[in-house]
């Protein structure tokens, strides 16, 4: 992965979980990592580790991507960017009846509008240099919705639709667009999404290792890879859903209602 050595890679949601792992892998390969998240204390810790273990170049830019007015300010502070990894996001698993409009707005602000705003912020420079890569972390939930994930699935459907259209718009510009569609990953995501722990327990055997997911994402940088779909068996399920939606909804609905 020496192809990313010296490249400036902006990672949102970098204070833990998948974003943190991606930052370490990129730094280990000599990339100049630019980290954003709300938790400045965690960003400081991650920067210290990168500096000590890999003598890596790392800068931190605290940011809540749900606050769209702050994105342009941080973008100006960062300077040039070769790769944007839109990783920031969260979910709340509730029924449609029990979910709130505040939850809906918060999820769309971060998962969708924040992602779009960060992308728009880097595009002019990438177009000028005729090279770049935008990697959007979506989800298998963006391909197949399940009970209690209506709002979260809606945000990830939006990310996939946006990314697919953007990829076509940027054809021939030298800018790649990749979406990452993982199933459940063993991270802090479920401390918010699934406070009772029932869903994590129910899908435990399908849980992905964040280090493995991060490795696949990092390896895809500056390739024309359209999508990364994980795990393979769950991705096969989404393809089956496209062919037999009623059957899959009946079977999956029963199993996944335990969120």
From Swiss-Prot:
NADP(+) binds at residues 11-35. It holds the Pfam family adh_short. Its EC number is 1.-.-.-. SUPFAM superfamilies: NAD(P)-binding Rossmann-fold domains (SSF51735). The active site is at 152 (proton acceptor). Gene3D superfamilies: NAD(P)-binding Rossmann-like Domain. Keywords: Oxidoreductase. Substrate binds at residue 139. One of its GO terms (cellular component) is membrane. One of its GO terms (molecular function) is oxidoreductase activity. Belongs to the short-chain dehydrogenases/reductases (SDR) family. This is Uncharacterized oxidoreductase YqjQ.
């Amino acid at each position: 992965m020496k192809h990313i050595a010296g490249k400036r890679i902006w990672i949102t949601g970098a204070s833990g979980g998948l974003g943190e792992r991606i930052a370490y892998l990129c730094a280990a390969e000599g990339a100049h990592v630019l980290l954003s998240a709300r938790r400045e204390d965690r960003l400081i810790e991650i920067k210290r580790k990168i500096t000590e273990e890999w003598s890596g170049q790392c800068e931190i830019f605290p940011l809540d991507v749900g606050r769209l007015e702050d994105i342009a300010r941080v973008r100006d502070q960062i300077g040039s960017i070769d790769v944007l990894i839109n990783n920031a996001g969260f979910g709340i698993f509730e029924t449609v009846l029990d979910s709130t409009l505040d939850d809906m707005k918060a999820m769309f602000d971060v998962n969708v509008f924040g992602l779009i705003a960060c992308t728009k912020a880097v595009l002019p420079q990438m177009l000028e240099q005729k090279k770049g890569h935008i990697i959007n972390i979506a989800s298998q939930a963006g391909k197949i919705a399940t009970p209690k994930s209506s709002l979260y699935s809606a945000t990830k459907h939006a990310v996939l639709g946006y990314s697919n259209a953007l990829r076509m718009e940027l054809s021939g510009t030298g800018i790649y667009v990749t979406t990452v569609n993982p199933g459940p990953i063993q991270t802090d995501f479920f401390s918010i999404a699934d406070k009772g722990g029932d869903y994590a327990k129910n899908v435990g055997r399908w849980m992905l290792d964040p280090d493995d997911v991060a490795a696949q994402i990092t390896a895809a940088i500056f390739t024309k890879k359209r999508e990364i779909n994980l795990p393979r068996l769950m991705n096969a399920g989404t393809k089956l859903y496209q062919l037999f939606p009623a059957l899959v909804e009946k079977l999956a609905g029963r199993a996944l209602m335990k969120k």
